């Protein structure tokens, strides 16, 4: 993205352009990119923009791509997303949907600016294709998924073509392996949402089943249409054993939910006949978009 022109140490072949001329070139190039390639889902401001370009870029975005998410775009777009602060594929826990700092956000901020986690398929933080580049293992990518998407962070996993302009077959296979895992693990809940009871305030949701099932993780999604309002929660399950079929046990608890929170139960797979989500702290009436449990081998 645009930078400030520095003409004090020009090298042979460099033009001595003014900041005004440079800004004009940038704006013309942005108009071309934002006009000739259809509707854009996301625009990256990787490195920011100069003060002199802030207002012109804001106007251009509003005119040409008003619905696009603007990565690092706070100040020029209302649809901004913030950087999580690392390219390793891990978000802090908790990770809030509000705040503009490059970290886990701020639950007390009035600025809605969800985080994006960008990382590479190749090892050693390598973004561009290389002849001898190696790929991250499937197990590592699964961990990346849980520590980004599962922590309320949008995952942007690098997609790099080779010198033919195509995605190498080995790369495509690794992407598919990750997709297959996500679909097989999280595609269907062991306890469907139809088997649900809740109180009028929606501060707790309980899933139940007539025959015991084995599960090892839970997924919560908060409806953030009017903001992120949940501040803490507990997930507990009703165990099935030979001595007491009515024993409740806490398997997960946390603070931020946001778009998605995946809790891998440290106690491992459990045989249960009910699971309950209790919202223990909220700043407004909570709306749970989804609450599911799963068993993943």
Regions found by a protein language model. Name each.
Residues 273-275:
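Exposed beta-strand face motif in extracellular beta-rich ectodomains
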